[in-house]
């Protein structure tokens, strides 16, 4: 699970977002499972947000 979240970091374009996510995941490696899930959710959210916003924009324009 942590490996997948690290993979998603590599696809984040913004350097500040990447470092913020890296810090989040590094701090949660020894934390609770809920913190790790939040880190993974943050990766998923950053990767899917552009796709979702494009989809919503296309839907509104229809």
Curated annotation (Swiss-Prot):
Domain of life (superkingdom): Eukaryota
Protein name (Swiss-Prot/TrEMBL): Protein sigN176
Taxonomic source organism: Dictyostelium discoideum (Social amoeba)
